[in-house]
Amino acid sequence: MDEAMNGPDADVVIVGGGPAGMMAGLLFARAGARALVLEKHADFFRDFRGDTVHPSTMELLDQLGLLERFLARPHNRINHAAVVWNGRTFRIGDLTHLDTPAPFIAMMPQWDFLAFLKDEAAAFPGFRLAMKAEVTGLIEEAGRVTGVTLADGRLLRAGALTVMADGRGSLVRCQGLLPLKGLGAPIDVFWFRVPRTLQSGPQPGNALRGVVSGRTILALIDRETYWQCAWVFEKGQAEAVRARGIAAFRAEIERAAPDLGDLSAVLPDFDAVSLLSVSLDRLTSWHRPGLLAIGDAAHAMSPVGGIGINLAVQDAVAAANALAGPMAAGEPLDPLLFRVQDRRMLPTRVIQGAQKAAHDFVLGPIASGRRETASEAPAMLRLFDRVALLRRLPARMIGYGFRRERLTAPAATGGR
């Protein structure tokens, strides 16, 4: 990484070391490119980031010959989903019937998943990862992005492409470099953990459980030793919730999910709770000459369905499929960038449409108090619970998403 003008620092400079950026770095390096990933933090450790690795992502790992090593890392598995509606449980999803090497959701802390990708990518000679490398600007020459500037003043030049995979706070968003369409989100989420004990808590079952009771909406994810819990509330009301006090917050959770037990030791104050400000938006153009946005930088997703990581990985695969071969052949990439957006925009719009419908017609009205939870569960929940075959439909959408990618990008020498 030299400022000298005697050549590019990498063929592809990737801004952001999240799932999209790390997977893109691995795939471009696998194809023989010099791929430089820039991550602004000193490590990958962030609590309450997406921890769900879905079957579509594990299919890709299987294609790469990495699935066995991935599953050797500590994780737990989710293969069923249910909703508890005013105290009655309805089964709504069953992943065990998916025809895939890993018919379950692997729950793994995101920092472990990223460390795994880093270790596997390091087997390719063209891969480099720079931590504490904060990008503050883009280098543009003759109307084309040719690299980035770092907070310490260094200039890093990309020989072929700059990929923005720097999340919903992306430089291209903050500086208005690509057009953004907001879809609105009427909810925010508080995350917290409840340790599992022998005396209390839902019975283990490798399940994702939603709870709807009165105005309370909870999601509980089985993490074996604890429950990862999400409490949904009206957008922008975090301070109002805090002002009511932690005792009132605990009481609402305990009423909705009494099997979690007494939460006074688990939630002594709001320091034990993390806020997720929910966004739902997308760029209407993901590229400009020399630059491509993928992952959350291109589309911020709601936590509904827990599919953000997997969409980001699918974007990285689509980018490598469309661009890695031409990059290796020395072809200009600018005329090809539209292919990535064309491939990935429809899945983005379909999934965001489903999330927006969930926001506008279920989560938002209940969380805001505009609508009380009906005493009887919706007919669709009752139907899924009665007909086991139907439970495969939501499982398929959650497990595979829409238009999942198959890896076609070339592989050069290297790797394990």
Residue ranges of each PLM-predicted region?
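Conserved FAD-binding catalytic core of PHBH/FMO-like flavoproteins
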Residues: 143-155, 160-278, 282, 287
